[in-house]
Every structure is written in structure tokens, then in C-alpha cells.
Design a protein with these regions (language model features):
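Acidic/histidine-enriched alpha-helical segments
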Residues: 7-15, 73-78, 173-184
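Active-site SXXK
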Residues: 19-20, 39-73, 101, 156-163
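Primarily short, surface-exposed interaction patches in extracytoplasmic proteins
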Residues: 32, 69-70, 98-99, 116, ...
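Conserved catalytic neighborhood of penicillin-recognizing serine enzymes
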Residues: 67-122, 165, 169, 181-194
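Active-site-proximal helix/loop microenvironment
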Residues: 132-186
Length: 194
């Protein structure tokens, strides 16, 4: 980050898949650097996760059987409650399968899937599971599919740990003797591994 003309900052969190053990945690690239707000721990700051929750949305939809692995979406412009979402490149591919919709990060397919799941249901489930450390969680509605649910990178890391842990929620472990608590699965192992 030092090579950029404009002051920028960066943060990184690396955790082991099975144990959640944190192997690297850097919340800022320069604590003393005021020009880049170095004293802010960006791993604890809420940010838009962009499209990173799409796998969770599709997994929940697979679990609830509102879509299937061979699902085909109609990737086209839509209007939802006066809102006209679009894909990031403003292009549409017509009929597209689930795998390609996820790989291409298609917003229309994710929003339509979240409509089928019910964003209220998924937000409530997510809140119960991942928001135990305090801090409010705003309602994102269908914008949850495109980054509207603000999370810390730590919360996002725990979301991906859960998916890597066959759907069972896992906490980041900042101590080497940390053991995962026994919890029931958030999503099924089959959906987590699809």
C-alpha cells in the first residue's frame, strides 16, 4: 500500500479452515499514519461485503428446496418494489444455470433467490448465529444479495468458516487452545459443499 500516490490502507485476516485458528491478523497497514487513518482496525469496521454472501443465499435456498442444483434463472432486467437492480456490468445473459450465476456473480439470480428464501428469514437466522458479539445489525432487505448487509471482515470470515465447516457455525480462535463449541448446523453439509 505504500506504493500508491493516494494514501490507502489495507487489512488482512487469515484463519485455519477446520479450527478457526487465526494465523494472521493485521487491522491496518500503518498504525501511526494519520493520512490513511492507520489507528482504525479495519477488521472490526463494518463494511459492505459486496457479493460475498451470495453462496450463503444459494445454500439456504438449496436447504429450503426453493431452488435446485440444476436451477436455471432468467438473467434479465427486473423491477422489484420500484427498484431496478442490475448486474455489475449492466449486461444480461438470458437463461443461466445456478453454478454459472454464482461464478459470474449475477445479481438478478441472487436477488430472485433471496426473494424465494425470504430475506426476513435469512437475516433473522444470520443475526441469531453471527451477531452474538453485540453491535446492531441493520435490515438490508433484498440488498443483502448485493452487499447491503454491512459486516465486519471478522464476521464475514466466520461466515466462510461456517461454510467450510459443513454448515456448522465456527468462531475465530485467537488462542491456540480454543475449541469449537458444539452447535447445530446453520445449513446442511450438502448445501455448504455444493
Amino acid at each position: 500500500v505504500d506504493g500508491y500516490q493516494v494514501p490507502i490502507n489495507g487489512a488482512i485476516l487469515i484463519a485455519e479452515r477446520g479450527s478457526g485458528a487465526v494465523r494472521a491478523y493485521v487491522g491496518s497497514s500503518g498504525y501511526q499514519d494519520r493520512s490513511r487513518k492507520g489507528a482504525v482496525n479495519y477488521l472490526m469496521a463494518k463494511r459492505s461485503p459486496g457479493s460475498t454472501l451470495k453462496p450463503l443465499i444459494y445454500a439456504e435456498a438449496l436447504d429450503r428446496r426453493v431452488i435446485s442444483v440444476d436451477q436455471v434463472f432468467d438473467d434479465r432486467p427486473i423491477l422489484v418494489d420500484g427498484y431496478r437492480p442490475s448486474n455489475f456490468n449492466n449486461e444480461y445473459d438470458g437463461r443461466i444455470g445456478l453454478k454459472q450465476a454464482l461464478l459470474s456473480s449475477k445479481n438478478i439470480a441472487a436477488i430472485e433467490t433471496l426473494q424465494k428464501v425470504g430475506y426476513e428469514h435469512l437475516e433473522a437466522k444470520y443475526r441469531r448465529t453471527f451477531q452474538s458479539r453485540g453491535g446492531g445489525m441493520e435490515t438490508a432487505g433484498l440488498a443483502m444479495a448485493v452487499g447491503g448487509l454491512y459486516l465486519t471482515p471478522e464476521e464475514l470470515a466466520e461466515t466462510y468458516l461456517m461454510m467450510a465447516n459443513d454448515g456448522v457455525p465456527a468462531s475465530l480462535a485467537f488462542e491456540t487452545d480454543h475449541q469449537l463449541d458444539e452447535q447445530s448446523a446453520f445449513i446442511t453439509a450438502g448445501a455448504a459443499n455444493s
